[in-house]
Amino acid sequence: MKRKLLSSLAISALSLGLLVSAPTASFAAESTSTKAHTESTMRTQSTASLFATITGASKTEWSFSDIELTYRPNTLLSLGVMEFTLPSGFTANTKDTLNGNALRTTQILNNGKTVRVPLALDLLGAGEFKLKLNNKTLPAAGTYTFRAENKSLSIGNKFYAEASIDVAKRSTPPTQPCGCN
């Protein structure tokens, strides 16, 4: 019985190794037809990417707007935790969405600074995660950097990515609530 279990585990491990190494070898070929064309024809292990965009009407400080973060781990195989880290001035809540579904309180950590997806699967770089921060007050003018990371059992190159947004300065300062200067 023990021998049968060990042999089936060995076969499973070998199969997984072949599954992972076969696409890597077949896609990693370099193009050498001309000197001008020196880039790879296909890349299996491209780095992770994150795109951050202010999708609302205003991009100026102290106004309300939506922010959309699109993360692609671009791994061959990954299973585990996906995590977004928000910069100072931004927080997530249950009115925000991940891939069109409202965030649950269990996905929001560190007082809204971290959004964690507990079980995420990316196979052959097909995974895409869209975090939409809805109706946020944009902080003071400046550049803000967001980070997304695949913290899991992964096979690939680079598992995190960063992207920045620029919040513009208001043309006129906001009025004081008391009407005083």
UniProtKB/Swiss-Prot annotation:
It is found in: Secreted; Secreted, Cell wall. Residues 1-28 form the signal peptide. It comes from the Bacteria. The keyword Secreted applies. Keywords: Cell wall, Secreted, Signal. Belongs to the BslA/BslB family. Forms polymers. This is Biofilm-surface layer protein A.
